[in-house]
Amino acid sequence: MGTGKFHIARYVMDEATGAYVADGAVRSLEDDFGFCRYKSITGINAIGKQKGVYTESYPESDSLRVYVDPSARQESISSTLSVCVFGSDPSLPSTLSTEELVKSAEDSWHELVGFLRGGLILWTDDYRQRKALFVLQDAIDPTTDSIKGLPYLDCKVKLQNIFGETFGSADETIENWLKLGGKGA
């Protein structure tokens, strides 16, 4: 993987082994889906509410009684990936008609959504040196807009962060969880 890129890999359950396995090659968000351009991702630095923490208060006490599970995990959190999908390279003039540009953008968009659906998505962000494991659950309804007369699709993809946090690029928590079929971490 090069620097300064957003990579996505899809994982599906292998029924024979019970492990999640890569479904094809790792793909670059901006290089492998036509003229898809990253806009933002929300929640990438968020951490979900900690599970396994219990508190009780009693009228006769000034403090809480607290139990913290030593192997506590976070609840999953939502992230929204925003991308702009163009029908041609937005940095170059195009000879395509508006209809052809929109059709090309729609084709690239459908290719991206087809990749995101039906599996778990390992997101690797070279800029932040972080990675996360997502699943696509919600409906997506892109809108059409234009910049300087160039039409594009403005797409917001709501993803669920399975672990409720991101990990450093060198961390193996996600890969180990995938190998164990979603059990343990």
Could you say what each language-model-derived stretch is?
Residues 1-185:
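Extracellular/virion structural assembly segments
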